[in-house]
Amino acid sequence: MADLITVARPYAEALYGLAKESGQEQAWADALQALAAMIADVQAQAFLTDPERADAEKVSLLSAVPVAVDVKAWKAFLALLIHNDRWPATAEIGTLFADAMRRAEGVVDVLVTSAIALDAGQKTAVQSALERRFAGHKVAFREAVDAALIGGLVIHTGDLTIDASVRGQVQQLARTLRS
Protein backbone atom coordinates (compact mmCIF):
# COMPACT_ATOMS: atom_id res chain seq x y z
CA MET A 1 0.00 0.00 0.00
CA ALA A 2 2.75 2.47 0.96
CA ASP A 3 4.54 1.69 -2.30
CA LEU A 4 1.43 2.45 -4.35
CA ILE A 5 0.96 5.71 -2.45
CA THR A 6 4.55 6.66 -3.26
CA VAL A 7 4.00 5.82 -6.93
CA ALA A 8 0.64 7.61 -7.01
CA ARG A 9 1.68 10.89 -5.37
CA PRO A 10 3.40 12.57 -8.37
CA TYR A 11 0.55 11.58 -10.69
CA ALA A 12 -2.07 12.92 -8.28
CA GLU A 13 -0.17 16.17 -7.76
CA ALA A 14 0.32 16.72 -11.50
CA LEU A 15 -3.33 15.97 -12.25
CA TYR A 16 -4.51 18.22 -9.46
CA GLY A 17 -2.39 21.06 -10.86
CA LEU A 18 -3.87 20.50 -14.31
CA ALA A 19 -7.41 20.27 -12.94
CA LYS A 20 -7.00 23.40 -10.84
CA GLU A 21 -5.67 25.33 -13.85
CA SER A 22 -8.75 24.41 -15.87
CA GLY A 23 -11.17 24.72 -12.94
CA GLN A 24 -12.25 21.10 -13.38
CA GLU A 25 -11.23 19.61 -10.05
CA GLN A 26 -14.51 17.79 -9.46
CA ALA A 27 -14.71 16.48 -13.03
CA TRP A 28 -11.20 15.02 -12.72
CA ALA A 29 -12.04 13.53 -9.32
CA ASP A 30 -15.12 11.88 -10.85
CA ALA A 31 -13.09 10.60 -13.80
CA LEU A 32 -10.46 9.09 -11.51
CA GLN A 33 -13.15 7.45 -9.40
CA ALA A 34 -14.77 5.90 -12.50
CA LEU A 35 -11.37 4.74 -13.78
CA ALA A 36 -10.54 3.13 -10.43
CA ALA A 37 -13.88 1.31 -10.49
CA MET A 38 -13.15 -0.02 -13.98
CA ILE A 39 -9.65 -1.13 -13.05
CA ALA A 40 -10.98 -2.92 -9.96
CA ASP A 41 -12.83 -5.29 -12.31
CA VAL A 42 -11.10 -8.67 -12.61
CA GLN A 43 -11.65 -8.85 -16.37
CA ALA A 44 -10.13 -5.40 -16.88
CA GLN A 45 -7.12 -6.40 -14.78
CA ALA A 46 -6.67 -9.56 -16.85
CA PHE A 47 -6.77 -7.46 -20.03
CA LEU A 48 -4.29 -4.91 -18.64
CA THR A 49 -1.83 -7.57 -17.47
CA ASP A 50 -1.98 -9.54 -20.73
CA PRO A 51 1.49 -9.21 -22.30
CA GLU A 52 -0.01 -9.95 -25.74
CA ARG A 53 -2.04 -6.73 -25.64
CA ALA A 54 -0.50 -3.60 -27.09
CA ASP A 55 -0.40 -0.42 -25.00
CA ALA A 56 -2.77 1.22 -27.51
CA GLU A 57 -5.37 -1.50 -26.86
CA LYS A 58 -5.07 -0.98 -23.13
CA VAL A 59 -5.44 2.78 -23.48
CA SER A 60 -8.46 2.20 -25.71
CA LEU A 61 -10.07 0.03 -23.02
CA LEU A 62 -9.50 2.66 -20.33
CA SER A 63 -10.70 5.41 -22.67
CA ALA A 64 -14.13 3.79 -22.58
CA VAL A 65 -14.64 5.38 -19.16
CA PRO A 66 -17.03 8.31 -19.69
CA VAL A 67 -15.39 11.55 -18.56
CA ALA A 68 -16.24 15.24 -18.54
CA VAL A 69 -12.62 16.41 -18.78
CA ASP A 70 -10.39 17.41 -21.68
CA VAL A 71 -10.23 14.20 -23.75
CA LYS A 72 -6.72 14.89 -25.05
CA ALA A 73 -5.35 15.35 -21.52
CA TRP A 74 -7.29 12.29 -20.29
CA LYS A 75 -5.90 10.05 -23.04
CA ALA A 76 -2.38 11.37 -22.42
CA PHE A 77 -2.77 10.52 -18.73
CA LEU A 78 -4.04 7.02 -19.57
CA ALA A 79 -1.18 6.45 -22.03
CA LEU A 80 1.30 7.50 -19.35
CA LEU A 81 -0.28 5.15 -16.79
CA ILE A 82 -0.11 2.23 -19.22
CA HIS A 83 3.36 3.00 -20.59
CA ASN A 84 4.86 3.29 -17.09
CA ASP A 85 2.79 0.33 -15.83
CA ARG A 86 1.29 2.51 -13.09
CA TRP A 87 -2.36 1.62 -13.66
CA PRO A 88 -2.45 -0.51 -10.45
CA ALA A 89 -2.03 2.75 -8.49
CA THR A 90 -5.17 4.33 -9.96
CA ALA A 91 -7.25 4.06 -6.77
CA GLU A 92 -4.45 5.68 -4.76
CA ILE A 93 -4.09 8.44 -7.37
CA GLY A 94 -7.81 9.14 -6.97
CA THR A 95 -7.56 9.13 -3.18
CA LEU A 96 -4.58 11.50 -3.16
CA PHE A 97 -6.31 13.75 -5.71
CA ALA A 98 -9.40 13.94 -3.47
CA ASP A 99 -7.14 14.67 -0.49
CA ALA A 100 -5.56 17.56 -2.41
CA MET A 101 -9.03 18.94 -3.19
CA ARG A 102 -10.03 18.79 0.46
CA ARG A 103 -6.78 20.45 1.56
CA ALA A 104 -7.40 23.25 -0.93
CA GLU A 105 -10.85 23.68 0.63
CA GLY A 106 -9.21 23.94 4.07
CA VAL A 107 -10.49 20.58 5.31
CA VAL A 108 -8.31 18.17 7.29
CA ASP A 109 -9.55 14.57 7.38
CA VAL A 110 -8.76 12.94 10.71
CA LEU A 111 -9.29 9.32 11.73
CA VAL A 112 -9.42 8.81 15.48
CA THR A 113 -9.13 5.19 16.60
CA SER A 114 -9.90 4.28 20.19
CA ALA A 115 -10.09 1.04 22.16
CA ILE A 116 -13.78 1.62 22.91
CA ALA A 117 -16.37 3.90 21.33
CA LEU A 118 -16.07 7.50 22.49
CA ASP A 119 -19.04 9.05 24.26
CA ALA A 120 -20.39 12.45 23.20
CA GLY A 121 -18.26 14.37 25.72
CA GLN A 122 -15.08 12.62 24.65
CA LYS A 123 -15.87 13.24 20.98
CA THR A 124 -16.37 16.94 21.71
CA ALA A 125 -13.08 17.11 23.63
CA VAL A 126 -11.16 15.34 20.86
CA GLN A 127 -12.81 17.52 18.19
CA SER A 128 -11.86 20.69 20.11
CA ALA A 129 -8.27 19.52 20.55
CA LEU A 130 -8.00 18.70 16.85
CA GLU A 131 -9.43 22.09 15.85
CA ARG A 132 -6.82 23.79 18.05
CA ARG A 133 -4.06 21.59 16.56
CA PHE A 134 -5.17 22.33 12.99
CA ALA A 135 -6.09 25.99 13.52
CA GLY A 136 -7.48 27.64 10.42
CA HIS A 137 -8.76 24.36 9.01
CA LYS A 138 -12.07 22.59 9.24
CA VAL A 139 -11.62 19.16 10.83
CA ALA A 140 -13.56 16.24 9.33
CA PHE A 141 -13.57 13.75 12.20
CA ARG A 142 -14.07 10.01 11.67
CA GLU A 143 -14.04 7.48 14.47
CA ALA A 144 -12.98 3.83 14.51
CA VAL A 145 -12.75 1.28 17.31
CA ASP A 146 -9.83 -1.15 17.73
CA ALA A 147 -9.86 -3.09 21.00
CA ALA A 148 -6.20 -4.05 20.43
CA LEU A 149 -5.22 -0.50 21.44
CA ILE A 150 -6.14 -1.44 25.03
CA GLY A 151 -6.73 2.23 25.89
CA GLY A 152 -6.01 5.71 24.58
CA LEU A 153 -6.20 7.00 21.01
CA VAL A 154 -4.41 6.86 17.69
CA ILE A 155 -4.96 9.96 15.56
CA HIS A 156 -4.16 9.72 11.87
CA THR A 157 -4.28 12.40 9.19
CA GLY A 158 -2.32 12.34 5.97
CA ASP A 159 1.30 11.60 6.82
CA LEU A 160 0.85 12.43 10.52
CA THR A 161 0.11 9.74 13.11
CA ILE A 162 -0.12 10.48 16.82
CA ASP A 163 -0.13 7.26 18.82
CA ALA A 164 -1.32 7.94 22.37
CA SER A 165 -2.54 4.38 22.92
CA VAL A 166 -1.54 1.96 25.65
CA ARG A 167 -0.43 -0.50 22.97
CA GLY A 168 1.79 2.17 21.40
CA GLN A 169 3.35 3.04 24.75
CA VAL A 170 4.04 -0.64 25.50
CA GLN A 171 5.63 -1.09 22.07
CA GLN A 172 7.78 2.01 22.60
CA LEU A 173 8.87 0.70 26.01
CA ALA A 174 9.77 -2.67 24.44
CA ARG A 175 11.87 -0.93 21.74
CA THR A 176 13.64 1.13 24.41
CA LEU A 177 14.42 -1.94 26.51
CA ARG A 178 15.80 -3.81 23.48
CA SER A 179 18.20 -1.02 22.54
From Swiss-Prot:
Please classify the protein's predominant subcellular localization into one broad category.
Answer: membrane
Q: Name one GO cellular component term.
A: proton-transporting ATP synthase complex
Q: Does the keyword Transmembrane apply?
A: no
| Presence of keyword Transmembrane | no
Gene Ontology MF terms in the entry: proton-transporting ATP synthase activity, rotational mechanism
Please give, as recorded in its UniProt entry, the membrane topology of this protein. Answer: Peripheral membrane protein
Stored InterPro entries: ATP_synth_OSCP/delta_N_sf, ATPase_OSCP/d_CS, ATPase_OSCP/dsu
Q: Gene3D superfamilies attached here?
A: N-terminal domain of the delta subunit of the F1F0-ATP synthase
**Subcellular localization:** Cell inner membrane
Q: Give the keywords, sorted.
A: ATP synthesis, Cell inner membrane, Cell membrane, CF(1), Hydrogen ion transport, Ion transport, Membrane, Transport
Pfam families attached to this UniProt entry: OSCP
Write out the similarity annotation.
Answer: Belongs to the ATPase delta chain family.
Chain's role: F(1)F(0) ATP synthase produces ATP from ADP in the presence of a proton or sodium gradient. F-type ATPases consist of two structural domains, F(1) containing the extramembraneous catalytic core and F(0) containing the membrane proton channel, linked together by a central stalk and a peripheral stalk. During catalysis, ATP synthesis in the catalytic domain of F(1) is coupled via a rotary mechanism of the central stalk subunits to proton translocation.
| HAMAP family reported for this sequence | ATP_synth_delta_bact (MF_01416)
Q: Which NCBIfam families does this chain map to?
A: ATP_synt_delta, PRK05758.2-2
The annotated subunit structure for this chain is:
F-type ATPases have 2 components, F(1) - the catalytic core - and F(0) - the membrane proton channel. F(1) has five subunits: alpha(3), beta(3), gamma(1), delta(1), epsilon(1). F(0) has three main subunits: a(1), b(2) and c(10-14). The alpha and beta chains form an alternating ring which encloses part of the gamma chain. F(1) is attached to F(0) by a central stalk formed by the gamma and epsilon chains, while a peripheral stalk is formed by the delta and b chains.
What name does the UniProt record give this protein?
A: ATP synthase subunit delta
Its ancestry begins with: Bacteria, Pseudomonadati, Pseudomonadota, Acidithiobacillia, Acidithiobacillales
